[in-house]
Amino acid sequence: DKIFTVQIAAVISAKQADTMIGHLKKRGVEGLYIVKGLQRSGGYWYKIRVGHFPSKDEAIAYANRLVDSKLIKNYFVISLPKK
C-alpha cells in the first residue's frame, strides 16, 4: 500500500524553504513539511511537500486547488510506502 504527497518546490537553502513555508502557512496551507536530500553536485535540496493522501487522484485534486488559488505554479505527486 502507498500514500501520496505533493511536492511543490525544491530549493537549495533551509532559509528559502522556511520562508516559502511561512508564506504558504499564512495563506492557510496546512500539512507542509521539508525533506532534505543530497544534490548530485554536492549540497542539499530542501524539498517542500504537503499532505498525505490515500490516492493519487486526491493528491492531484488538492494540488490543483493550490494552483487555481495561485499559491503554487507547479507540482508533482510522489508515492510513498505506507508506514
Name each model feature, range by range.
Residues 9:
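Conserved beta3-strand ATP-binding lysine motif
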